[in-house]
Amino acid sequence: MKFFAVLALCVVGAIASPLSADEAAIVKSSWDQVKHNEVDILAAVFAAYPDIQAKFPQFAGKDLASIKDTAAFATHATRIVSFFTEVISLSGNQANLSAVYALVSKLGVDHKARGISAAQFGEFRTALVSYLQAHVSWGDNVAAAWNHALDNTYAVALKSLE
């Protein structure tokens, strides 16, 4: 039991300002508008930042147009988007903080092993937000909720890159 109390304190410290229920609802609602556009989301990231595409051995050095409609691309895009869907679905509930922390920490650890830099995490964020702005109902409240969510996510993931 003591372990879980310590873990909970670590999570709260790492995610000092978790999303409110209202912010989580805004993020979930906007994500629901695009979460089935997996291929388009990943293609937008690769188009904006070819250096990210170069980190994927199965896609490195290939023309985006030639890989976008392949099963391998769709499968990988679905993995990425499904990760976000899982984290978003857990957001807004204090009881889920340790689960969110574990998922996002693992994301950072896994990407550190692949040589992904903090700058590339930043590029991914920029491309994702640009995609969201163009494809969902976007206003100041949506921007604020997404920034809060991504700030929390990146604080944990980037700590794992250290």
Curated annotation (Swiss-Prot):
GO cellular component: extracellular region; hemoglobin complex
Binding site for heme b: 76, 111
Keyword Transport: yes
Residues annotated as domain Globin: 18-162
Pfam family, one: Globin
Superkingdom as given in the UniProt entry: Eukaryota
InterPro entries recorded: Erythrocruorin, Globin, Globin-like_sf, Globin/Proto, Mb-like_M
Secretion signal, residue range per the UniProt entry: 1-16
Record-linked CDD domains: Mb-like
Alphabetically ordered keywords of this record: Heme, Iron, Metal-binding, Oxygen transport, Signal, Transport
GO molecular function: heme binding; metal ion binding; oxygen binding; oxygen carrier activity
General remark: There are at least 12 different components in Midge globin.
Family indicated by similarity: Belongs to the globin family.
Assembly behavior: Homodimer.
Protein name, as recorded: Globin CTT-VIIB-7
Taxonomic lineage from the root: Eukaryota, Metazoa, Ecdysozoa, Arthropoda, Hexapoda
